[in-house]
Amino acid sequence: MEMDMDTIRKAIAATIFALVMAWAWRVLDWAWFTPKRIEKRLRQQGFRGNPYRFLVGDVKESGKMHQEALSKPMEFNNDIVPRLMPHINHTINTYGRNSFTWMGRIPRIHVMEPELIKEVLTHSSKYQKNFDVHNPLVKFLLTGVGSFEGAKWSKHRRIISPAFTLEKLKSMLPAFAICYHDMLTKWEKIAEKQGSHEVDIFPTFDVLTSDVISKVAFGSTYEEGGKIFRLLKELMDLTIDCMRDVYIPGWSYLPTKRNKRMKEINKEITDMLRFIINKRMKALKAGEPGEDDLLGVLLESNIQEIQKQGNKKDGGMSINDVIEECKLFYFAGQETTGVLLTWTTILLSKHPEWQERAREEVLQAFGKNKPEFERLNHLKYVSMILYEVLRLYPPVIDLTKIVHKDTKLGSYTIPAGTQVMLPTVMLHREKSIWGEDAMEFNPMRFVDGVANATKNNVTYLPFSWGPRVCLGQNFALLQAKLGLAMILQRFKFDVAPSYVHAPFTILTVQPQFGSHVIYKKLES
């Protein structure tokens, strides 16, 4: 009997040892051998970069360069790549365009050839979003249709698209105008008393565009939607911290201060949105007419999709899906337009001749009357200016995808698990595409449209390109056109003496040390 027990104990110990060794081998393969195998394959195809460092990759080096780049402002010019992406810039300068960096254990190649960029953005099923390599808590913010793939993405995009038709955008214009009118009236009163009015425009436009999205998405004012906005801002800061860390699987489940706070914020936002949505759904089921805002259009479109699919349970979006899309409306809807208006104002302050051209065009079209939808879309100079601002200061500085299986890209075979980065902010400065003045603010390059400016290359990506082009790009551009037109009707503006040029990126490209601009009321 003792012999039997001893044999059993040995068998159990051997089994445990084998399991531990198997687990250790899998971890070692995940953390070392797989990255090294991918590195070897990339080098064999002519890609160059730093050798892989266990788990951390280039994160320490990148973090140090990033910290150094942001430690001081720069001269006012548009050569912002060394400040926004110093490590990528250094890597490409050192190893060439066919290079790679390490995001922890994940290799990331840089793609800068127009035909390869087109291939990546055309085949979105092969080149997918890379949120899975980050802490899962990142998805509390980076959610909705922009984060989905495959059938779920197709379904969500189909349901959401009706909210962004030209007809719907036209119906939103009065709500846009009310928000801008209220802000500009306050500015006018201050300017009349003081002769001018100094404004830190980025936080001001941030609040303004949040007010706009609250009205057009939920039919509520900024005061009512303000809590959601403030919570999303806090969640955004915490999300950035997560994305900068090397993610270790399981880390998101630990009760760290950051993890706990992110979960608390997400629950609070979700509960508030659920209350709004359930109230709307109850009214629709009672036969009441739907409201003509983004949420109303989304809910009606969702009901139609469910009916079209034979009232199947998974035929449309669930309440949780709708909540995630509302978060995306709030975050993307206000953030993109806020930064676009900020950089447009700063660049027009530095280029007063273009400010005057745009003002003359606006006054000729509308005088001092409220801008109308049809003529707003035919403001040529204003459109050219916005396109040029989006070229020099795109909302996001890169588009990064990941391949989940070996994938042919041109003459290369990209190994499974590799990220593919399209460095937007660099592509927008390529002299071979944009000419010798690529670093200069020159809206005339868009006089014959984007296709002519890019020589029909896929190298202008402020809102991405292809099947996954941003659904809200016309929403952002219309709001920016209206805002700029209404400001030009009432004010001249110049950057304040205190302004220092320091673009940096927190998901979007923002001014690091403030964005003070002086507004002077136009003579009647």
Swiss-Prot record:
The keyword Transcription regulation does not apply. SUPFAM superfamilies: Cytochrome P450 (SSF48264). InterPro entries: Cyt_P450, Cyt_P450_CS, Cyt_P450_E_grp-I, Cyt_P450_sf, Cytochrome_P450_Monooxygen. The chain crosses the membrane at residues 12-32. Heme binds at C470. Pfam families: p450 (PF00067). Pathway: Alkaloid biosynthesis; secologanin biosynthesis. The keyword Heme applies. One of its GO terms (cellular component) is endoplasmic reticulum membrane. It is an enzyme of class 1 (oxidoreductase). Keywords: Alkaloid metabolism, Endoplasmic reticulum, Heme, Iron, Membrane, Metal-binding, Monooxygenase, Oxidoreductase, Transmembrane, Transmembrane helix. Upper and lower leaf epidermis. It is found in: Endoplasmic reticulum membrane. Residues 1-11 are lumenal. It catalyses: loganin + reduced [NADPH--hemoprotein reductase] + O2 = secologanin + oxidized [NADPH--hemoprotein reductase] + 2 H2O + H(+); secologanin + reduced [NADPH--hemoprotein reductase] + O2 = secoxyloganin + oxidized [NADPH--hemoprotein reductase] + H2O + 2 H(+). GO terms for molecular function: heme binding; iron ion binding; monooxygenase activity; oxidoreductase activity, acting on paired donors, with incorporation or reduction of molecular oxygen; secologanin synthase activity. Its cofactor is heme. It is a single-pass membrane protein. Its EC number is 1.14.19.62. Residues 33-524 are cytoplasmic. GO terms for biological process: alkaloid metabolic process. Component of the seco-iridoid and derivatives monoterpenoid indole alkaloids (MIAs, e.g. secologanin) biosynthesis pathway. Catalyzes the conversion of loganin into secologanin. Catalyzes the conversion of secologanin into secoxyloganin. Belongs to the cytochrome P450 family. This is Secologanin synthase 1. It comes from Catharanthus roseus (Madagascar periwinkle).
